Amino acid sequence: MSLKRKNNAREGTPDEDLEEYSDYSDVDNYGEEDDDSYKPAPRIRINNNKTKAQTTTNSNEARQSGISAMFGQNDFSNLLGLKLDHTARPLWINPIDGRIILEAFSPLAEQAIDFLVTISEPVSRPAFIHEYRITAYSLYAAVSVGLKTEDIIAVLDRLSKTPIPPSIVDFIRACTVSYGKVKLVLKKNRYFIESGDASVLRLLLRDPVIGPLRIDYSTQSSKQKSSKPSNEDNVEDKKDITNDSSKETAEKSSSDELFSAVVGLQEEEDDEDAVHLFEIKHSSVETIKKRCAEIDYPLLEEYDFRNDNINPDLPIDLKPSTQIRPYQEKSLSKMFGNGRARSGIIVLPCGAGKTLVGITAACTIKKSVIVLCTSSVSVMQWRQQFLQWSNIKPDHIAVFTADHKERFHSEAGVVVSTYSMVANTRNRSYDSQKMMDFLTGREWGFILLDEVHVVPAAMFRRVVTTIAAHTKLGLTATLVREDDKIDDLNFLIGPKMYEANWMDLAQKGHIAKVQCAEVWCAMTTEFYNEYLRENSRKRMLLYIMNPKKFQACQFLIDYHEKRGDKIIVFSDNVYALRAYAIKLGKYFIYGGTPQQERMRILENFQYNELVNTIFLSKVGDTSIDLPEATCLIQISSHYGSRRQEAQRLGRILRAKRRNDEGFNAFFYSLVSKDTQEMYYSSKRQAFLIDQGYAFKVITNLKGMENLPNLAYASKAERLELLQEVLLQNEEAADLDDGEDTSFGSRSLSRAPAKAKRSSGSLSTLAGADNMAYVEYNKSANKQLKKDSKEHHALFRKHLYTKRR
């Protein structure tokens, strides 16, 4: 307390004194019943007219007011009371939104983290405090691995500092009570909704969305009726579902028509109750899965692959020399349980061995596999990885790309393709159509979706229903999108089954320890003046081509090359990419680089000691595997994309051969100060900060001015560069859309427009900037001139006279 407050206390102003004390009352010790050090005894001596009870009540109210003012809407002191031994418990739960705050420094943190990863989704995991969120889909995933509702509640209560809020208990019960009651089953390339409870199927068939999507056998031809699944118990079970009083009334009732598609199967060996089902259309699978999740009956997708005698087995096993790491084994344990495979998503950081996880899953299921990637280069890498880690024969692996259209000739095999090849809806060549008929005409045991975050895109999401597969596994390092479609993966693929902790893997040496830094580059006076005058697109070009940023890039390349590092420089802007690379004498790859030249540059970067730096556009975000790279410099990016930032960091995350103490990889993001680029940079870093990475801010690179042959050191050079930038048209500010999802393959996007709308000056209309003024649709102008109805009466008279 300040000296002034002490003097006021001596002057005998009890009300004022009580208010001052309330600001510094026992907030830190709130809830500790044994501590009497902050009892309001001194105030009683000051205010002799108040009783002890009255003073204590006023103190508590004032203290509560101080807490509410400090924490606002996050003040739960009235809702949550601390347990007596709360210091020994590691977490507490927000009663409003289901957030879980975990003390990562607690002795029980490791056990708590394993449990929380199973029942919730990680939101933020820095060094000392972790944040998780309980969602409906995370609880579905928890129940799918065998956890029971009461067990989830009991363990949470054991770990929580406070009693579990009733709202959270009710939410857990509501989300887990109906999970597993309805299954999506694939039989002979036909989809069925299956349940052991006929009343649940009645509920689904009454739904206005699901009901019309079933296949109604009454409208099928006699031939189609004969193909309906049947056995000895079908008729009796069907009667059990649809018959209310008698056979005659059931035939006339509308409920009989509604449930005529419900068919019972034979009793299973481990279940005494009959199983009931109805068939749905292939094209409606996505809609039904989404609707079932909305009405709290999520479809369970499990594959009893060991008892599948219809689909042939694939002869594949891991090689004896192949060893999987503990976190890879843990992720697979979430997928497999009770001899069955579940559909879902596994999230592992770049360089942590996602490919080996997928191959191990394929070796476990031992059925035909289709692997979908983002590019043709990834396709060849997956094929090579299958041959490296497993004992599969080369002729059992087929490749389906623009250049290769192979089929395996055995009963079972592996097909590796791209999302674009499968999702294409345009006219196909004869070979491509024949290959697609092969993919869609058979039943697949396992579909593996690499970089699964691209699936929610409108173009790619159709691949999930185009290919009929028993089990789906999605792999990604960055389960984030900027269009809020990432939640669609929960019903398109399945819930997130496992997400690794990046910092934990780095500490154990499974991935590199990366030092992240943001280098602030001041804008030169000339460039900043033009930046303030230009439009938004040209502004981007100005802050990317900032001479100070160029010098920082040159200095960092020189510094790390002398250390023996291999450096990747990323730029989404192709004009800047070419300008930087040509000025510094380095190789560069962008969307227009031929495939053969790309591979030659990458091989030189990997094996040639004289090639230590390459420049890449966004084509290298996800499609290259360069474990030799130890330093990454980013000079231009795709606005505020969090996913791209993490994917680029992943280019240097693979465990390094150099085991230096401390950091063994470096990530620099060059940002022009006082520009819009700083805003985008802060947005991009959000995902990595949530993973526990810290970004240092570097405002001055010591020794940069003394670098020999420093580019644009004189004002004349900077002015010349500025003139070159200003002479560029707006197209130079475009980002490289060059096949970032088809690195080395033909893009299936629309062909570029023959003309582009652009602003320009009079000199542009006169032929500058390689532009031309062309007037289209001249006949329409003539027609308007002839049309007299649109003219005023005075002008119509003049026009009539002229025509005569």
UniProtKB/Swiss-Prot annotation:
SUPFAM superfamilies per record: P-loop containing nucleoside triphosphate hydrolases (SSF52540)
Motif stretch (DEVH box): 450-453
Positions bound to ATP: L348, P349, C350, G351, A352, G353, K354, T355
InterPro entries referenced in this protein's UniProt entry, alphabetically: ATP-dep_DNA_Helicase, ERCC3_RAD25_C, Helicase/UvrB_N, Helicase_ATP-bd, Helicase_C-like, P-loop_NTPase, XPB/Ssl2, XPB/Ssl2_N
Listed GO biological process terms: transcription initiation at RNA polymerase II promoter; transcription-coupled nucleotide-excision repair
Domain Helicase ATP-binding: 335-497
Biased composition annotated in UniProt, kind: Basic residues: 794-804
Molecular-function GO terms, alphabetical: 3'-5' DNA helicase activity; ATP binding; ATP hydrolysis activity; DNA binding; RNA polymerase II general transcription initiation factor activity
Compositional bias per record (Low complexity), positions renumbered to this chain: 47-60, 220-229
Compartment(s) of residence: Nucleus
Biased composition (Acidic residues): 14-36
Effect of Q647A: Inhibits growth when overexpressed, dominant-negative to wild-type in vivo, inhibits transcription in vitro, promoter opening occurs and no longer requires nucleotide, promoter clearance and RNA polymerase elongation do not occur
Effect of K354R: Inhibits growth when overexpressed, dominant-negative to wild-type in vivo, inhibits transcription in vitro, strongly inhibits promoter opening
Region Disordered: start-end pairs: 1-61, 220-255, 736-761, 782-804
Compositionally biased residues, Basic and acidic residues: 236-255, 784-793
UniProt keywords, alphabetically: ATP-binding, DNA damage, DNA repair, DNA-binding, Helicase, Hydrolase, Isomerase, Nucleotide-binding, Nucleus
Entry GO terms, CC: nucleotide-excision repair factor 3 complex; nucleus; transcription factor TFIIH core complex; transcription factor TFIIH holo complex; transcription preinitiation complex
Helicase C-terminal domain span: 551-705
Family classification: Belongs to the helicase family. RAD25/XPB subfamily.
Function of the molecule: Probable ATP-dependent 3'-5' DNA helicase/translocase. Binds dsDNA rather than ssDNA, unzipping it in a translocase rather than classical helicase activity. Component of the general transcription and DNA repair factor IIH (TFIIH) core complex. When complexed to CDK-activating kinase (CAK), involved in RNA transcription by RNA polymerase II. Also involved in transcription-coupled nucleotide excision repair (NER) of damaged DNA. In NER, TFIIH acts by opening DNA around the lesion to allow the excision of the damaged oligonucleotide and its replacement by a new DNA fragment.
Assembly: Component of the 7-subunit TFIIH core complex composed of XPB/ptr8, XPD/rad15, ssl1, tfb1, tfb2, tfb4 and tfb5, which is active in NER. The core complex associates with the 3-subunit CTD-kinase module TFIIK composed of mcs2/cyclin H, mcs6/cdk7 and pmh1/tfb3 to form the 10-subunit holoenzyme (holo-TFIIH) active in transcription.
The protein's name in its UniProt record: General transcription and DNA repair factor IIH helicase/translocase subunit XPB
Organism of origin: Schizosaccharomyces pombe (strain 972 / ATCC 24843)
Gene: ptr8
